[in-house]
């Protein structure tokens, strides 16, 4: 584990080549489909070039967290990700290799999860504000990543592909 931050999170660094079977067990190998880069090691064990790290991290936490007293546990990493994008483009949009910060929260119940989620969302808002980036937090489709709820921070740009509606009278 790495350094502890203001919301009690810890920085980690996970393998870029986890075993493919973790993604197969979760069903995400099928969901990602041809977006996955796969290969085999010298013993012919299938590996995946990680498009995300949920399976590997969940297996690690399952093996090492033995009590609710160890929770909440908030882990994050800034890591290079790889996806075989169907329409790669230049610049920072839709590239096959990109850096991403992902954060994961393990909590005792759904209420505690909501507290962790709100703290992380506020931490992101603070970072964007310090950088002078006028982002908008929007509801998002969790897609292949999965999950009950998902949000994205959008920075308005003419080169983007998404269209959003903004209500000037809403929060």
Residues covered by each model-derived region:
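Short, small-residue-biased leader/transition segments that mark boundaries at the very start
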Residues: 1-7
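TRNA-recognition modules of translation machinery and tRNA-sensing kinases, especially anticodon-binding
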Residues: 8-171
